[in-house]
């Protein structure tokens, strides 16, 4: 590579870097103080809304760890987007304020800060199972209250529902037995008590 090609490549890389802002997750300070937060976003159920919400995260280099969307009020055409993201308190507050400014957004609630939220997730976990590992997989499934939803002579598919941490633990314990793959729904969350989110 000659010096002209190298200079051109450097110029292209600097333009690309300028087009994408630095991630708030990339600083060592940001990682040290980063906490996981579950945001509940009530939006109009119309085309393009999810793309606008996800675009806000993408444009600012915010990571989405989990995302679920469903209509919650058919008569008023409202949907709830549940987003799990990590960041410093300042980053989460910035995300919340930017979401609130989007036109189709009715409300944004940080369910993590209320400490009154219930979070659940469903996962289907496929595991190889022969001989002793078959017995071990079934014992672990029973301990975690996972249901067998499919079984062959060589594998199982378990269905497990619970807090994300419980599912993480179940998956980690299945790895040495013969974990094949996992499909997760993402987090669904709701606040406790009689009041709506």
Language-model regions, residue ranges each:
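Regulatory modules associated with amino-acid/nitrogen control
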Residues: 1-197
């Amino acid at each position: 590579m000659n010096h002209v090609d190298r200079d051109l490549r450097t110029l292209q890389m600097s333009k690309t870097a300028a087009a994408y802002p630095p991630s708030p997750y990339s600083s060592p300070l940001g990682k040290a103080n980063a906490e996981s937060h579950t945001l509940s976003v009530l939006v109009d159920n119309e085309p393009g809304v999810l793309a606008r919400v996800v675009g806000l995260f993408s444009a600012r280099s915010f990571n989405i760890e989990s995302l679920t969307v469903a209509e919650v009020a058919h008569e008023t055409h409202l949907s709830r987007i549940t987003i799990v993201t990590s960041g410093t308190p300042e980053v989460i507050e910035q995300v919340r304020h930017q979401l609130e400014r989007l036109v189709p957004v009715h409300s944004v609630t940080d369910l993590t800060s209320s400490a009154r939220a219930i979070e659940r997730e469903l996962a289907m976990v496929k595991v190889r199972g022969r001989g002793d590992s078959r017995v071990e997989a079934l014992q672990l499934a029973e301990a975690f209250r996972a249901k067998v939803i499919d079984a062959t002579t060589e594998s199982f598919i378990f269905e497990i529902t619970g807090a994300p941490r419980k599912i993480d633990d179940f998956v980690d314990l299945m790895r040495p037995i013969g974990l094949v793959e996992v499909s997760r729904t993402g987090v669904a969350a709701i606040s406790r008590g009689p009041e709506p989110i």
